[in-house]
From Swiss-Prot:
GO terms for biological process: mitochondrial electron transport, NADH to ubiquinone; mitochondrial respiratory chain complex I assembly. Pfam families: NADHdh. It comes from Pongo pygmaeus (Bornean orangutan). Its EC number is 7.1.1.2. Core subunit of respiratory chain NADH dehydrogenase (Complex I) which is composed of 45 different subunits. This is NADH-ubiquinone oxidoreductase chain 1. The chain crosses the membrane at residues 2-22, 69-89, 100-120, 146-166, 171-191, 222-242, 253-273, 294-314. It catalyses: a ubiquinone + NADH + 5 H(+)(in) = a ubiquinol + NAD(+) + 4 H(+)(out). PANTHER family: NADH DEHYDROGENASE SUBUNIT 1, NADH-UBIQUINONE OXIDOREDUCTASE CHAIN 1. It is found in: Mitochondrion inner membrane. Its main location: mitochondrion. Belongs to the complex I subunit 1 family. One of its GO terms (molecular function) is NADH dehydrogenase (ubiquinone) activity. InterPro entries: NADH_UbQ_OxRdtase_su1/FPO (IPR001694), NADH_UbQ_OxRdtase_su1_CS (IPR018086).
Length: 318
């Protein structure tokens, strides 16, 4: 039974990721006053499958000077981590109920840095290496903010268990008392997933395509799949942490439906930002984090630690 659940979850995520790619291309098309993909299948609905077929049937070329093992392992590692992160998410019942679910997500998502680092270094290309250095610095930097925001959230929730967040938000969303945290979290997730306006790693005018410049065919597709899977995951986390859905034990499908709608709306916001905003300069990106977000999240963390002590109120203990 657990194997069937795992397969169903994986298949659902991969199908959602495929159609997210199509949706993005459609939205970008309409914002630029054109149609987007509309040839393959009705309204272009079969375009993701045509792309997958094309990429996975092509010969995966490899630079002769590359480090073979790391070059091959990196894309597979990126997608594996992206799928692994879904296991502790309660929708409303998680695949694996972890007491330290938030910590697991934080620790596992930080491993994505290795796939980026290996892919750029193993490619033996200057463009890929510069893209890698940018991506790694950006990802590691914004993880600090995400960790501090999660720490503030679990001080309000009282547990590392993600299922507790559903109980915490029975009466009102955490978005209402902690909207500055939610705003910084959302912007940090944009940076963490290397999305516009923070897509410095894929600065086409400077770096060709970033850390995946030397990749083609299947491995290239795996990187893209990992990126879009991470986008859905980050929005699912945002919906779970700040826009919690009340769970009625008699109708779990209602919880799942509402949770999915919230995730879809947040993902649409990601796509709207992609089609609207220009790319930041690299120094502005780092300035935003180290000079603005970090002091503010630290101040809010101190506030969330000191307030319960001052008022002799403690969060629910599990």
């Amino acid at each position: 039974m657990p194997v069937i659940n795992l397969l169903l979850l994986t298949m659902s995520i991969l199908i959602a990721m495929a159609f997210l790619m199509l949706t993005e291309r459609k939205i970008l098309g309409y914002t630029q006053l054109r149609k987007g993909p509309n040839i393959v299948g009705p309204c272009g609905l079969l375009q993701p499958f045509a792309d997958a077929l094309k990429l996975f049937t092509k010969e995966p070329l490899k630079p002769s000077t590359s480090t073979t093992i790391l070059y091959i392992v990196s894309p597979a590692l990126a997608l594996t981590i992206a799928l692994l992160l879904w296991t502790p998410l309660p929708m409303p019942n998680p695949l694996i109920n972890l007491n330290l679910g938030l910590l697991f997500i934080l620790a596992t998502s930080s491993l994505t840095v290795y796939s980026i680092l290996w892919s750029g270094w193993a490619s033996n290309s200057n463009y890929a290496l510069i893209g890698t250095l940018r991506a790694v610095a950006q990802t590691i930097s914004y993880e600090i903010t995400l960790a501090l925001i999660l720490l503030s959230v679990l001080l309000m929730s009282g547990s590392f268990n993600l299922s507790t967040l559903i109980t915490t938000q029975e009466h009102s969303w955490l978005l209402l008392p902690s909207w500055p945290l939610a705003l910084m979290w959302f912007i940090s997730t944009l940076a963490e997933t290397n999305r516009a306006p923070f897509d410095l790693t894929e600065g086409e005018s400077e770096l060709v395509s970033g850390f995946n410049t030397e990749y083609a065919a299947g491995p290239f597709a795996l990187f893209f799949m990992a990126e879009y899977t991470n986008i859905i995951l980050m929005n699912a986390l945002t919906a779970m942490i700040f826009l919690g859905t009340t769970f009625n034990i008699h109708s779990p499908e209602l919880h799942t439906t509402l949770f999915t709608i919230k995730t879809l709306l947040l993902t649409s916001l990601f796509l709207w930002i992609r089609s609207t905003y220009p790319r930041f300069r690299y120094d502005q990106l780092m300035h935003l984090l180290w000079k603005n977000f970090l002091p503010l999240t630290l101040a809010l963390l101190m506030w969330h630690i000191s307030m319960p002590i001052t008022t002799s109120g403690i969060p629910p203990q599990t």
